[in-house]
């Protein structure tokens, strides 16, 4: 089933401590791909992952809630100001990110 990254991003930035968010699909051992959300916080005080996921769960169906939250200082953008999901995937790859259920 298709999950809207825009819906997840909008739900995440609704959290008072999140200034920007990007949702992307990552490899999942059972479901082929599942969403995670990458967030930039307003300050150095980062909310707990479950706090963000619980906040998102109020706005989307249970099966759409991302499986993980990754904190970054900034999310890469294209020259036109859009989130560069290609560069974001590269950053996650460079970090050796693995879906939590794959470990």
What do the PLM-derived regions correspond to, one by one?
Residues 1-64, 74, 81, 87-90:
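AMP-binding/adenylate-forming catalytic core of the ANL superfamily
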Residues 69-72:
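General small-molecule cofactor/ligand-binding pocket signal
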Residues 92-103:
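Acidic/polar alpha-helix N-cap and adjacent early helical turns
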